[in-house]
Amino acid sequence: RGADVVIVDTAGRLHTQSNLMDELTKVRRVIAKQLPGAPHETLLSIDATTGQNGLRQAKIFAEAAEVDGVVLTKLDGTAKGGIVLAIADELQIPVKLIGTGEQLEDLRPFDPTDFANALLSEG
């Protein structure tokens, strides 16, 4: 009560568990009922190590929660996160943030040029 920002973390919800996806849809509906126009932003966090399964995961989450942006995490290892290109294209939603570590300062705005260069690099 009286909060300006509410963060709902749905970690652990697998897109293959329809009952959990149904709960997610209900949570969104309840939030919208409590505050007209809410939620104001819904971001899907995708692990950079996720392969082609990430596209299916994103489609199901987008259907359940009306996702309007992607956060690509775990870019601090060898994973390059190329699946995010298919997600952004297929679902027509932008990649908004990238995570390169575990601290707040490791979360930064997505830069398409930097991402393309890193994706195509051999390192």
Where are the predicted features?
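P-loop/Walker A NTP-binding module and the surrounding RecA-like catalytic core of P-loop NTPases
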Residues: 1-123
